Amino acid sequence: MFQNNPLLAQLKQQIEASKEYVEGVVKTSDKSYGFLECEKNSYFIPPAEMKKVMHGDKVKAVVKRDGDKEQVEIDSLLEPMLERFIAQVRFNKDGKLQLAVDHPSINNFIPANTQKKVTEPLENGDWVVAQLKTHPLRDDRFFFAQVTQFICKADDNFAPWWVTLARHEQPREPVANEKSYELQDQVEREDLTHLYFTTIDSASTKDMDDALYVEPISENGTQTGWRLVVAIADPTAYIPEQSAIEKAARQRCFTNYLPGFNIPMLPRELSDDLCSLVPNEKRPALVGYIETDLSGNVVGEARFVSAWVQSKARLVYDEVSDYLEKVENHWTPDCAETAQQIDWLHQFTLARIDWRSKNALLFKEQGDYSFELAEDGAVKAIHIDYRRIANQMIEEAMIIANICAAQFLDKYAHTGVFNTHSGFDSKNLEPARKFLLDTLANDENRESLSERYSPERLSTLEGYCEMRRDIEQFPENFLEMRLRRYLTFAEFKATSAPHLGLGISHYATWTSPIRKYGDMVNHRLIKQVLSNQTAKPVEETVLARLQEARKQNRMVERDIADWLYARYLEPMVEQNVEFDGEIQDVSRGGLRVKVIENGASVFVPFSTLHNNKEEMLFSPEEIALYIKGEKAYQIGQAVKVKLKEVRVETRSVVGDVLI
């Protein structure tokens, strides 16, 4: 009777048209209800509806109103929070397999089975990779998952490493070795084994990929400059372009340096032995000859050759720094030739630092945090390491070598893997200009600074460098940290473009081919030019993978560090330990404070800062918190914090600001 009834169809259309649909992301609470966070509003999700969804699901819902109360009824799934995910195994009282998702806001226990290829017997707490197979909104069934990969046992002390690598789909083993390695040389190598090359690395370094030789250039008995000879290990001499090793390196893109150990991009036989520039061993290398005047300015064009080299001495950063800084009871070079190389490289470095301070941009010293681990992976201590003079000596040599390689590739290959950075994001040029003027301008200089910081000028290499030098004199970190928010990301490009972050017009790395795939690509291109071949254009897929891998490696490093910090700090909560810190971020939820002593990130909820929410105002433009109309906390501000709670299972560290 009602079938094909036009009036009924019209009624259905009217009812559907009267519904108010919204789209948003599900957010759970510590109760059975939740919220749908939409672009402009937040809607209550009742407990019955929450059973259909999971935290993070993107859904479409219908708004229901009862007087002035609003809630939503879930309509459909737009995008699930979970597809592939990390979880811990749990067996319920009936012995049924369930999975506890490794996410701080997902408390569901998901029923699961195990893929046949997973042969390890599972126990409570074991770490696994799983795939969500069914979703109530998509499949008209309850949540159900399947274990697809075993990661490690519950009591494995190295779980932070293995779980994080699995989360980001990164390998945990080196590339498999070949039975043998043969040279693939197409050009004859020059014999440079007579030059007194030295390496400077950390004491534990095995993959030594750069060695240096430096000498003064003289005219009529007067020194006029420096000749730097940069020898870089040449793994492409052993790796055919279509080999399995090449393909693996192209996928990995970088050696992954993790707390306690690394996972090399190449087989260890290549990275740590056959290609490593160990002392007194003849090694194939790509060598660049670079000449400067006494002011550190590059003179002429760099020359590149394929060569044989032999490192004469393996030096260590701290020992060389102690020697040059005349630290008490310092190490001393064991021969005059080594001492001479250290002295000359030191003089060359000072000239280059001075040149870069005037013509490019210097790095602001921040210090690097490193974990000292016991054999079982426990954190014994956390150290902050600053770049000392020996580190700067290698840094300056590598920077000038990369500048010269970029110029060479641009001129002769017309392609390459170029490191570029365009400074401020184009959409942030006007906000950056406004912030600079609000912070630095006064009645006397406003007109000149307005022109100096115009969007057009800030987007140029010269204008950006001027601005950076202007703010160097300001001790307040908030200036630097605020400006950082307006920057775009560095990019790999196949054609040369400026790197504003370095203040340099051309930059392409080739000095770490054992550790970076982009450097391997640049090696091949330089060697193609040297052998009079047409250089093959760098594929966009290579650049995209480099960009993606760099991001993945940073996330891996961050996630492992967060886990280790939680382990390290947990025992300190009961000790009421206080730390000096610096506010790194201000968000709607609270402050993010970096502990200066060890680099840990501590979250301070807004609710602990003031007892009246109505008197607090968060300013996203200023990245600041106002209390009773006065700015109380802002990015870059020094504060003292005390640990309040550490949850290792969610890697969260919560603290209080001490007034």
UniProtKB/Swiss-Prot annotation:
Residues 576-658 form the S1 motif domain. Keywords: Cytoplasm, Exonuclease, Hydrolase, Nuclease, RNA-binding. Transmembrane segments: none annotated. GO terms for molecular function: exoribonuclease II activity; RNA binding. One of its GO terms (biological process) is mRNA catabolic process. It is an enzyme of class 3 (hydrolase). GO terms for cellular component: cytosol. InterPro entries: CSD (IPR011129), NA-bd_OB-fold (IPR012340), RNase_B_OB_dom (IPR013223), RNase_II (IPR011804), RNase_II/R (IPR001900), RNase_II/RNase_R (IPR004476), RNR_Ribonuclease (IPR050180), S1_domain (IPR003029). The keyword Acetylation does not apply. It is found in: Cytoplasm. Residues 189-532 form the RNB domain. It catalyses: Exonucleolytic cleavage in the 3'- to 5'-direction to yield nucleoside 5'-phosphates. Its EC number is 3.1.13.1. Belongs to the RNR ribonuclease family. RNase II subfamily. HAMAP family: RNase_II. Involved in mRNA degradation. Hydrolyzes single-stranded polyribonucleotides processively in the 3' to 5' direction. This is Exoribonuclease 2.
